[in-house]
A protein has these predicted regions:
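RNA-binding accessory domains that recognize and position tRNA/RNA substrates
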Residues: 1-72, 81-114, 133, 141
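Aromatic (phenylalanine/tyrosine) cluster motif
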Residues: 75-76
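Active-site-adjacent beta-strand anchor residues
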Residues: 86-90, 126, 157
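Active-site regions of enzymes building and remodeling cell-envelope glycoconjugates
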Residues: 105-106, 121-124
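Short amphipathic alpha-helix with an adjacent loop that forms part of the alpha/beta core around
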Residues: 114-120
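Cysteine-nucleophile active-site neighborhood
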Residues: 121, 128-178
Length: 178
């Protein structure tokens, strides 16, 4: 990591990929296709969030159970006394979901571009993720709609914070070192 730090210090942020196994065939687990375009020198204009976000709605309960539903079908959330948090998946880390569940809330994980505003929920969490926030206009529009509810708690982390800022009217630009 010391050598990598030196390169990044000299040249700024770079896209890259970590491979865990030299025998890896380079295939994307979901599609089975070889993902040869990563890493690429292109950052601006490429929607990396779309590549890593879930493609369906996933409803997690604190007891460890979960159900899945197509993002294109109607989604019914059973009534319960637990608080419900919609998690906009921009590339969420599994530990974030575990941390929310440990706090006793239901988590409704939706794709980055899903219009969650028709759901009944108590809080909105916009996750971390890779890439350029300027490629996520659908998420920004949905977040902007949610922001009209002044009593709704909204939290964004990393990419989620940038999308929340854009929804509020901020301009986002990439710094040389991240």
């Amino acid at each position: 990591t010391r050598e990598l730090t030196k390169v990044l210090r000299e040249h700024g942020v770079m896209l890259g990929r970590i491979e865990f196994d030299k025998e890896s065939d380079g295939k994307n687990e979901e599609s089975g296709k070889v993902d040869e375009e990563l890493p690429t020198a292109v950052y601006e204009g490429v929607n990396y969030v779309d590549r890593v976000s879930c493609k369906e709605i996933i409803h997690y309960l604190p007891d460890g159970t979960s159900t899945r539903s197509s993002a294109h079908s109607s989604f019914f959330i059973p009534h319960s006394s637990l608080k419900k948090v919609v998690l906009v998946d921009c590339g969420v880390k599994a530990n974030i979901i575990r941390c929310l569940l440990r706090r006793g809330v239901e988590v409704i994980r939706v794709p980055w571009n899903y219009d969650f505003n028709g759901l009944e929920f108590d809080g909105l969490f916009i996750s971390n993720g890779p890439g350029d926030p300027d490629t996520c206009d659908a998420a920004v529009q949905n977040i902007r709609k949610a922001m009209k509810n002044e009593k709704l708690p909204i939290f964004g982390i990393c990419m989620g914070n940038q999308l929340l800022s854009k929804a509020g009217g901020a301009k986002i630009y990439k710094l040389k070192y991240g």
